[in-house]
Amino acid sequence: MCGKASSHGLSWSEVYAWAATLRAPKTLPADPASRRNISPSRLRRKAEPDSMVWETLPVIRATDDCDQPDDAIWPFIPPYSEGRLPHNKQGRLISTANARLRDDGAPFAPTFMGAWRANMRVLVAVSWFYEFDRRVRPQIPYAVFPLDAPCWLMAGIGRFTRMPDDSRKLTVAIITVAPNDVLTGVGHHRSP
């Protein structure tokens, strides 16, 4: 998955009517904002930490009473990076928008294992996601729509983080696997 998605026209009532096994809350919140080009949170200007643009994705997380719709900051913020995008030891940003499911050993990279062990799994609800054919220049974007559903419900892994304003926010990474034939056909190596 390339890291771009859409919540255009997403309706919680349609999602819960379609996914009948979800336990809807007594009152649904307002539908997610209709956005066509959501990408992971980023700094507008690398030299200015205050230029942070926090992006969110609509998610559904299990609570004791129901499967609750929510907004989650994208990408996942690991424990060692509380309230800010993660960096490596050299100070470069680390991409945590996607959690790659591994074929052997631990299911995910160590960054995601604490959330996995804590059972912080969510469903990420999007109208469509984008894939770019990286085999050609300029890259060609493809919007990948579900044919028989109101949205994609993608597996995600979440974690609550403390933000700079001292609030607690849910953050999310989309779980990716090897692509199916359709996504392989557009030149991509991972799939939600």
For the regions a language model picked out, list residue spans one by one.
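Short linear sequence motif anchored by a di-proline
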Residues: 1-192
